[in-house]
């Protein structure tokens, strides 16, 4: 099975200085699984909301309101369980003039820790093309990293999967303001497959990369295969791979 070593890279540690945004709230009962643990799709929603708060705190919400995520990495070190309050720390791990890698750390008050990183592109909503970050944005976000020459490099580049197929019907509630399937919805599919692999437990890593948008009404299927402790997934419309995911032990 094809293996890209980038998938094994450790996420950067939280810095001791610079602009680190901190917020928190109680773990919602709507975001837990049958074991009362925070699900992956819940993690994705939470880090998206923390990102929106972070932009508002930086007074950048109106300057750079539109972002598209190309990759999300979720490292479940220890599951966060109900009841728990969650503290979120968000900071920039690397950036360039049009995109950035943003780290979010989740810490549960009753134990549990989840580390995440997202590769976000600032976009023009009308053209859906990358938009240049303001100097103020670069200065504020760049205060937590020395890497100001970030480049996009996909991790999940293996061949098409011919494994098990699982239909994944879409709903109108899955559609975002760009008229595409919201990035957090894919994590419902990842969770569906994770539950079929009972031997894959924390600590583990989940990676999701988005290749091209999925629109309402398109027939979506998940194809997946398992080799030892690694599970590969493709979200396909016909034979067109729209997103790829990977699960592996840490």
Curated annotation (Swiss-Prot):
<dbReference type="InterPro" id="IPR050563">
    <property type="entry name" value="4-hydroxybenzoyl-CoA_TE"/>
</dbReference>
<dbReference type="Pfam" id="PF20791">
    <property type="entry name" value="Acyl-ACP_TE_C"/>
</dbReference>
<dbReference type="InterPro" id="IPR029069">
    <property type="entry name" value="HotDog_dom_sf"/>
</dbReference>
<dbReference type="InterPro" id="IPR049427">
    <property type="entry name" value="Acyl-ACP_TE_C"/>
</dbReference>
<dbReference type="InterPro" id="IPR002864">
    <property type="entry name" value="Acyl-ACP_thioesterase_NHD"/>
</dbReference>
<dbReference type="Pfam" id="PF01643">
    <property type="entry name" value="Acyl-ACP_TE"/>
</dbReference>
<dbReference type="GO" id="GO:0006633">
    <property type="term" value="P:fatty acid biosynthetic process"/>
</dbReference>
<protein>
    <recommendedName>
        <fullName>Uncharacterized protein MT2057</fullName>
    </recommendedName>
</protein>
<dbReference type="GO" id="GO:0047617">
    <property type="term" value="F:fatty acyl-CoA hydrolase activity"/>
</dbReference>
């Amino acid at each position: 099975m094809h293996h890209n070593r980038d998938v094994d890279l450790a996420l950067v540690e939280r810095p001791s200085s610079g602009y680190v945004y901190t917020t928190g709230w109680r773990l919602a009962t709507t975001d837990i699984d049958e074991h009362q643990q925070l699900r992956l799709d819940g993690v994705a929603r939470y880090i998206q909301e923390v990102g929106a708060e972070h932009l508002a705190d930086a007074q950048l919400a109106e300057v750079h309101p539109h972002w598209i995520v190309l990759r999300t990495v979720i490292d479940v070190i220890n599951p966060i369980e109900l009841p728990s309050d969650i503290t979120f720390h968000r900071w920039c791990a690397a950036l360039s003039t049009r995109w950035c890698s943003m780290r979010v750390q989740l810490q549960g008050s009753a134990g549990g820790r989840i580390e995440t990183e997202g590769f976000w592109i600032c976009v023009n909503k009308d053209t859906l093309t990358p938009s240049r970050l303001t100097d103020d944005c670069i200065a504020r976000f760049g205060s937590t990293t020395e890497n100001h020459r970030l480049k996009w490099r996909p991790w999940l580049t293996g061949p098409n999967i011919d494994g098990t197929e699982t239909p994944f019907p879409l709903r109108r509630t899955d559609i975002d303001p760009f008229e595409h399937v919201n990035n957090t919805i894919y994590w419902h599919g990842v969770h569906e497959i994770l539950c079929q692999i009972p031997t894959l437990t924390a600590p583990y890593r989940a990676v999701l990369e988005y290749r091209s948008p999925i629109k309402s009404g398109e027939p979506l299927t998940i194809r997946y295969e398992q080799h030892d402790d690694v599970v590969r997934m493709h979200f396909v419309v016909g034979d067109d791979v729209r997103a790829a995911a990977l699960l592996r032990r840490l």
